[in-house]
Amino acid sequence: MEASNVALVLPAPSLLTPSSTPSPSGEGMGTESMLLLFDDIWMKLMELAKKLRDIMRSYNVEKQRLAWELQVNVLQTQMKTIDEAFRASMITAGGAMLSGVLTIGLGAVGGETGLIAGQAVGHTAGGVMGLGAGVAQRQSDQDKAIADLQQNGAQSYNKSLTEIMEKATEIMQQIIGVGSSLVTVLAEILRALTR
């Protein structure tokens, strides 16, 4: 990085002062003016680094909050799925018990004809209960699919946020690198001036 490039990017009023030290572009620039320019550039770099640090901190807090809310939402959907599956199982079990009770009850009352009628009524009741269980199971499967989608979305979202944070860290390192380069250039200039 040449000093003239820095001066062109960030002009300072102190560049207008007369000097005995010529710059690479042929204009005069005093040692004090150059030091003030480097100091100004350094201060601006540090301000940018501090702002980026603060943004990264608040971003990280927000990222954690959003990730937590997504995980809670996924958990709630999964709990709903478990409840729906349990309800389907209860309906199926109730249908099987009702079928058995009707078969035994009508069989005891009506003999062989009652047993056949009991089985028919029991199977019909079991079928109706099975239909209700199927509806509940369908709802459970839909809720599970939604929970899986939410889980995948939460993971993808979290990955995207992490990648953004990595980019911000990379930018912070570049700012620090530019600052180090600036210090090196200043040291070289001061060494050249003291010869």
Curated annotation (Swiss-Prot):
Q: Where in the cell is it found?
A: Secreted; Cell surface; Host membrane
Q: Name one GO biological process term.
A: protein secretion by the type III secretion system
**A Pfam cross-reference name:** SctB2
Domain of life of the native organism: Bacteria
Query: Does the keyword section mention Coiled coil?
Result: yes
Instruction: Give a yes or no for keyword Membrane in this entry.
Output: yes
Inactivation phenotype: Disruption prevents SpvB-induced F-actin depolymerization in human macrophages without affecting intra-bacterial SpvB protein levels.
Q: Transmembrane region positions? A: 90-110, 115-135, 170-190
Q: What are the record's GO terms for cellular component? A: cell surface; extracellular region; host cell membrane; membrane
Task: Give the UniProt keywords, A-Z.
Answer: Coiled coil, Host membrane, Membrane, Secreted, Transmembrane, Transmembrane helix, Virulence
Question: What does the subunit comment say?
Answer: The core secretion machinery of the T3SS is composed of approximately 20 different proteins, including cytoplasmic components, a base, an export apparatus and a needle. This subunit is involved in the formation of a pore, called the translocon, in host membrane. May form a complex with SseB and SseC/SctE2. SseB is required for correct localization of SseD/SctB2 on the bacterial cell surface. Binds to the chaperone SseA.
The task this protein performs is described as: Component of the type III secretion system 2 (SPI-2 T3SS), also called injectisome, which is used to inject bacterial effector proteins into eukaryotic host cells. SseC/SctE2 and SseD/SctB2 are inserted into the host membrane where they form a pore and allow the translocation of effector proteins into the cytosol of target cells. Required for the translocation of SPI-2 effector proteins. Required for systemic Salmonella infection of the mouse. Essential for SpvB-induced actin depolymerization in the host cell cytoplasm.
UniProt record similarity statement: Belongs to the SctB/EspB family.
Q: What's this protein's name?
A: SPI-2 type 3 secretion system translocon protein SctB
The record's gene field reads sctB2
